[in-house]
């Protein structure tokens, strides 16, 4: 399975970033291409993307104590985003590891571009909220 990682420093405390990552209602504030999020079935949420308002993307959001990770998984494509936060001078470090199933491998570069834009926006929004 293809995978990649991205990392950025953030001038906000980890708690501010955690709030954005853990609250699906706030995804449109920072997740590139996300138009809106609605409650889904069984604790999942449904993301709707810019330009694709009629294509639901069921999404699971879970947190793991070990590694202090938030895992956001698209239940349609099985693309998994694992976000981790670490304390750093003046704020925190934000890292994301993305795993793409072989069936979706052709989407590697578009997903990487989306993640880079999302990470930059996440850091910006968290910093503004701090």
Task: Write out the residue ranges for each language-model feature.
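Membrane-targeting and insertion segments and their boundary/processing signals
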Residues: 1-4, 8-11, 55-56, 92-96, ...
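Hydrophobic ligand-binding cavity/cleft-lining segments
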Residues: 1-40
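A short, structured loop/turn motif at beta-sheet edges
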Residues: 11-15, 62-67, 85-93
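A structural signal for well-ordered alpha-helical scaffolds and beta->alpha junctions
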Residues: 14, 54, 112-115
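Hydrophobic pocket/interface hotspot
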Residues: 17-21, 27, 45, 61, ...
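Short, low-complexity, polar/charged sequence segments that are solvent-exposed and flexible
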Residues: 25-29, 38-39, 65-68, 90-94, ...
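Glycine-rich portal/gate segments that line the openings of hydrophobic small-molecule binding cavities
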Residues: 28-32, 36-80, 129-130
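Beta-strand/loop substructures that line and gate deep hydrophobic ligand-binding cavities in soluble
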Residues: 71-128
């Amino acid at each position: 399975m293809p995978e990649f990682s991205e990392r950025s420093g953030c001038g906000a405390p980890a708690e501010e970033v955690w709030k954005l990552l853990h609250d699906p209602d706030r995804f449109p504030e920072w997740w590139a291409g996300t138009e809106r999020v609605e409650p889904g079935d069984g604790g999942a949420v449904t993301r709707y993307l810019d330009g694709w308002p009629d294509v639901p993307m069921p999404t699971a959001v879970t947190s793991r104590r070990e590694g202090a990770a938030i895992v956001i998984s698209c239940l349609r494509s099985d693309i998994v985003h694992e976000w981790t936060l670490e304390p750093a001078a003046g704020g925190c470090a934000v890292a994301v590891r993305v795993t793409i199933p072989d069936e979706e491998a052709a989407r590697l570069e578009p997903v990487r571009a989306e993640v880079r834009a999302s990470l930059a926006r996440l850091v910006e929004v968290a910093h503004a909220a701090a």
